[in-house]
Amino acid sequence: MSQTLSFVLKTHSVRKDFVHSVKRTLARRRDLQYLNNKLSRSMRAEACPSCASYDVCPNCTSGDIPDDGSSTMTIPSWEEITKTSTYSLLLSEDTSDELCPDDLVNVAAHIRKALSTQSHPANVEMCKEQLTSLLVMAEAMLPQRSRSMIPLHQQHQTARLEWREKFFSKPIDFLLERIGVSKDILQITAIWKIILEKACYCKSYGEEWFNIAKQKLREIKCFEGNTLKPLVGAFIDGLRLMTVDNPNPMAFLPKLIGLIKPLNLAMIIDNHENTTSGWIITLTAIMELYGITECTIDIITSLITTFYDKLAKATKFYSQVKALFMGFRSEDVANSFWYMAAAILCYLITGLIPNNGKFSKIKACLSGATTLVSGIIATQKLAAMFATWNSESIVNELSARTVAISELNNPTTTSDTDSVERLLELAKILHEEIKVHTLNPIMQSYNPILRNLMSTLDGVITSCNKRKAIARKRQVPVCYILTGPPGCGKTTAAQALAKKLSDQEPSVINLDVDHHDTYTGNEVCIIDEFDSSDKVDYANFVIGMVNSAPMVLNCDMLENKGKLFTSKYIIMTSNSETPVKPSSKRAGAFYRRVTIIDVTNPLVESHKRARPGTSVPRSCYKKNFSHLSLAKRGAECWCKEYVLDPKGLQHQTIKAPPPTFLNIDSLAQTMKQDFTLKNMAFEAEEGCSDHRYGFVCQQSEVETVRRLLNAIRVRLNATFTVCVGPEASNSVGCTAHVLTPDEPFNGKKFVVSRCNEASLSALEGNCVQSALGVCMSNKDLVHLCHFIRGKIVNDSVRLDELPANQHVVTVNSVFDLAWALRRHLSLTGQFQAIRAAYDVLTVPDKIPAMLRHWMDQTSFSDEHVVTQFVTPGGIVILESCGGARIWALGHNVIRAGGVTATPTGGCVRLMGLSAQTMPWCEIFRELFSLLAKIWSSVKVSTLVLTALGMYASRFRPKSEAKGKTKSKIGPYRGRGVALTDDEYDEWKEHNASRKLDLSVEDFLMLRHRAALGADDADAVKFRSWWNSRSKLADDYEDVTVIGKGGVKHERIRTSTLKAVDRGYDVSFAEESGPGTKFHKNAIGSVTDVCGEHKGYCVHMGHGVYASVAHVVKGDSFFLGERIFDLKTNGEFCCFRSTKILPSAAPFFSGKPTRDPWGSPVATEWKAKAYTTTSGKIVGCFATTSTETHPGDCGLPYIDDNGRVTGLHTGSGGPKTPSAKLVVPYVHIDMRTKAVTAQKYDVTKPDISYKGLICKQLDEIRIIPKGTRLHVSPAHTEDYEECSHQPASLGSGDPRCPKSLTAIVVDSLKPYCEKVEGPPHDILHRVQKMLIDHLSGFVPMNISSETSMLSAFHKLNHDTSCGPYLGGRKKDHMTNGEPDKTLLDLLSSKWKLATQGISLPHEYTIGLKDELRPVEKVAEGKRRMIWGCDVGVATVCAAAFKAVSDAITANHQYGPVQVGINMDSPSVEALYQRIKSAAKVYAVDYSKWDSTQSPRVSAASIDILRYFSDRSPIVDSAANTLKSPPVAIFNGVAVKVTSGLPSGMPLTSVINSLNHCLYVGCAIMQSLEARNIPVTWNLFSSFDVMTYGDDGVYMFPTMFASISDQIFGNLSAYGLKPTRVDKSIGAIEPIDPDSVVFLKRTITRTPQGIRGLLDRSSIIRQFYYIKGENSDDWKTPPKTIDPTSRGQQLWNACLYASQHGSEFYNKVYRLAVRAVEYEELHFEPPTYSSALEHYNSQFNGVEARSDQINMSDGTALHCDVFEV
């Protein structure tokens, strides 16, 4: 094997003549074979690109036609070949001897056959798969330019290209899966190239490619015993601990108990709950028990990351198991046991199932294993073989990745800078990964190969760095040209100037040579006589040098290709005063970049004039260059006298400024300043400002400060380097710069206030502050003194340089190592330490080597920590602070020395002087450091107290027994009591009918008490049951039942039991149940596996049901289907089912007011622990009058809005049936996706907007501005005589500068105040009365609308579409039908409504455009418009429009007057009702909408629901209208707590019902306050007419006598009752002959009973007219619709005719004037004509097309404005 390996790897070093000889010989012989037809063509049925490289291709199952050889003659055997001198010379380095051509042909034939077939002897030690891997390995170790010499290189490259074409478009998951399962190294290499190529171009393919590439490069598909060795090691350690270390187990037991603390642990586990808070409490208690709270808080992030790593490895397990069953080949093995043991051992060591190619070697090794001893020996041999295979697989994997990366290092593949940077990062990652394996002792034999791989990657990294440097912007150098006559000393001055600019030797460039391989890249570059040759384009060369763009030099040597010009200072010399002529095209660019110094030597010039022809003596030159005169020209001076013309025309027109004379020192300083200024403005110093500290002092103190800093460095054993000036040198850590005030510096500056060199002898405490007078924070000082740049490994150790030990750790186990390393690491580094510690388990003797590698890829914390590790392999000292330094000693030392002082910084004192010299950032950093210290001291206690608070306040209900034992057999006590057959039947029947579990003794005692006339509750109920049983004694029949259980004799009931019909005395006098269950359509039964009822559940919507835990415990079914996705939170739980009930109930966290049957609930609603027969249960105690029974658990308790707030879970039993235990509703997230879009997002934080608590929206909808109301052309001069004007227009309106937003906010604030309303019991009793009263003329079970479009067409299409769709409904209609946008919105809401799910109750807010009284305009009062969602309006119309129509159809007789026409005979019916009353009260209310109680509105909605068919549409509409409304305006959403939106569907009917309920409650409360029990229906005792907030109360004398208390109660409910005319004073009875209702005065006129419209309402119709929207309402509209305006004024005249001729004449004059000025086309009627027309319309003789018969109108034309 080693010989073949050497041959393959050394083929590339064979001489070229040998290669050519082999090729020529093979070609000649092949041609001869074809001519003689003795060599058949090599054929291979290939199915994939890699088939040619394998005996049995791992990718396909294609058959092979093997090649029989390449020689026409007989060739020597392989054994003979290996003995030839040619073969020996091939394996040696010496190839100078002549090689025999025939031997070379024979060797090539054998190698070719070994690579193409498996029948060759060379394959005995090495299969073809291994040969292919070796060739790929050879490719990886060689530079790319040398790989063409490797055998089959071109064939492998072609195969990889074809694989690339097949897999390039595949997703990343597919490629990673192929890498994990593929055994073809060519395919693996191609896949790696695809992944890395897309990672380099992640901008195009996605960042996930780059992230996954980095992650996978760090992972090697290997198996180094990480599974087997830790398990065996742990077993051995545990066995040693129990036997050798502690032979007495009994002595060890107390220690174990004391360590585990089982009692405390058991109590913690016993109180654990499977909830979020429960887990927090339990884990905190366990951490506190074992004292690991603090460290657990620090490493929780690492644990989460580890969990995800485990998940990522799940697919690998599947692949291995699949390969185990699919990859075996049948073998003839006699010793199957050892064969199986070998396969298992191979898997445990290598992590791979042995393939068929390796089975033969396993079989050969085990062929002699016939005894136990021989089997053990064979197993040992196999273990060594498997270890070698494992290492080979690792090297193959690394080789494939190296080849992929090296092939990507090509400008045609990675072309842009971003791809090069990413390729560089990937190459570094792979380089570090290979470096890891060089430290692995198992891989030591492969270190030469690994080093070659690293060398290849070093070449890639170097190439990428060069390519990056070419594209990177560089610092612009400074170029000075020394011009002057020859011999004046320019070149010598240039050399001296270079020494003053830099300590380095200057680089020299000669422009006469076209290549610059000699350029060294030093800071100073000298170009002597740069313009001496006319053949050189020196101008462009200089322009390229003095530029920020990289300049690539022309170099001939291969290793210098890509060399860049990097010098900072360029000094050039020239004999010409004008190096570039001003007329040149490049003159401007040239002179802008250079500075010219005119150099003259007066001594030399005077000598030449005085003694021409003689040599210049040395005395004319001085060492300090004082003999030279250096005159610096101005900018862009092309000669001494002139400056370049900016226009490039006349270059001798602009005079040059006078020169500046310098010496050699000032010239050097000027060049430094020019370089700093030139580059400071464009590019800040990169990456080092955080590690540079400047100490500013005076020039005379520089040396003293430098010595003080060096003393501080020695005193604190610091890592910083002291530098004088802003320039920094290489340093292990930070750099401390001693600066003068004028020097620029990029870093942190500190001003030295004092420096005393005497303090060098005693530097103690705060040495920096005491010695330098500098106030530095502790963080800055620790960073300055101990920061370590990068990771440094020190092999040579000096004890006096070692840092002081802070911690000394003896490493007995890997856990000691991991625990100590925790102090050095950041959060991400701690996870890396866990992985490193796990790896150390396998090689504990190599800890120094492992630490050396581990620190290369670990992130360390910023705290300074020094730890000494005492390991079996020696001493390791680790120092970390940002970076890390490590010292590894192969021997033990007593103490690692070092200075023990700890640096301390200055403390910021706000009242002291130290803070004056510190920037604000340092002061705030000191504050944050203080807060961090406080947090570090209280973080554990904070967590414990938080968990303790959760434990004290958490809700912990437990399951409750439901009155049955688990065997479903009651306790049969009292067996000694003898019962007759009738008594026994009576006892059984009593327990069955009343669902009790009484024993025989208890039953007999109860019957005895009832017979004696006891008045306790149980005796009374028994007597009631006995009477009912006696009446129904004949309703039973004896039957015989034949079933699966056999023949049984039973008694069955022949008639159905019916509830007792309760009269008014019971119904209206008190609240008692049971009655009909709430949310009946949303309640379902939960059964067991046998179908027996266990309890109830409530549908929440979308197949999610709520119940209690003990009902759904065990096997539970709903509608015959097993429930799933069960989630619990205490006793409250939720589950899913595919069976969906027709309706859903809304849930709310609050206090209930009704039990499941409608009875009132009295409760404090506080969760407490209660002792029951099943143990302690935590729930809320409640009291109701309804008796419950086992099996009622899960029924809902509701609040006044019908929302479920709790579920029934237990009762007090027969002794206290009124006591109930209720589980409050708690939120459980069961969402799978968003149900419907809504504006109000509860997950967003609350904000305060002008005093309103609201949610911010993503969309902003502004409040419409302007008005459509304009002054009529007839009244532009006298419009102020009208009592009304258009409402305030906002901040620009001089009548009231209040903005529209402020008006809306002020109007919404009352809606955000809580309104209690009437008492609960009073309200529900009055609700019953009103239902009973309405049921006399409103039918029951009115069907809801089932067609969505039919319901939509019942709406007013002139109104808003609501918050989800802009505009009005008619704007989204085509040919009378809704368009797609509107239809999609309606369909989405209708779909939810048909499932009984409530919809978002949201409105868009606007302001009503109307006429308002002048005084209200000045106050800025406007009425809000609530634009309801069109989807909600459609659903409500479908649910309640028919019920509403049934109520309004009887307005003449009922209390609700919605729908009445006040211009019809209906007013006469109202008049008759008013006249029949004893006392009449006309009442109006101020701010009616905002003072409505939600409980009263919910009661009114329940009244509508009562008369409906209870369909899911009805449930959805009712639950939606009961939910709190949300007002949307100006980009915010406000959820109001009270009030009734004016735009709510059916608002007039609901408002009228509210009005009736309020009045009824006030009357009942007033009567019962006077000890008058109300046992009758109040609405049968008095009459009331309501239309929204307008009301007329017709009280009998008894009610009138307490009217003050009635109106007082109304005020107590939150209402604001007032007189109709808004005058101040008590509400008193009015004259029945002039009642004002709906702005109409109902009175008798000569024509009969009429409703007279208010006169001011008629008159203002003539002053204002509707037109276009504008802010200028005083200007008449541009266009007037004569038809609409004429109809409006015609109606006004008709209404005015009812007030008499005098008033009509006034109106007539206004009408005539309006016709004249407005150019209308009608003639105002005379008084008699108007009177006749009105009476005709009143009596129905003449139809009115403009008549409004709607719930929100007042029987006026649509253009007649309301008050």
Curated annotation (Swiss-Prot):
CDD domains in the cross-refs: AAA, Caliciviridae_RdRp
Keyword Hydrolase applies: yes
Gene3D superfamilies xrefs: 1.10.260.110, 1.20.960.20, 3.30.70.270, 6.10.250.3230, P-loop containing nucleotide triphosphate hydrolases (3.40.50.300)
Site feature location: Cleavage: E46, A47, E331, D332, E685, E686, E960, A961, E1071, S1072
SF3 helicase domain boundaries: 458-614
Modified residues (O-(5'-phospho-RNA)-tyrosine): Y984
Biological processes, Gene Ontology terms: DNA-templated transcription; proteolysis; viral RNA genome replication
Residues the record marks as active site: H1110 (for 3clpro activity), E1131 (for 3clpro activity), C1193 (for 3clpro activity)
Domain Peptidase C24: 1073-1229
Source domain of life: Viruses
Name of the protein: Genome polyprotein
GO MF annotations, alphabetized: ATP binding; ATP hydrolysis activity; cysteine-type endopeptidase activity; RNA binding; RNA helicase activity; RNA-directed RNA polymerase activity
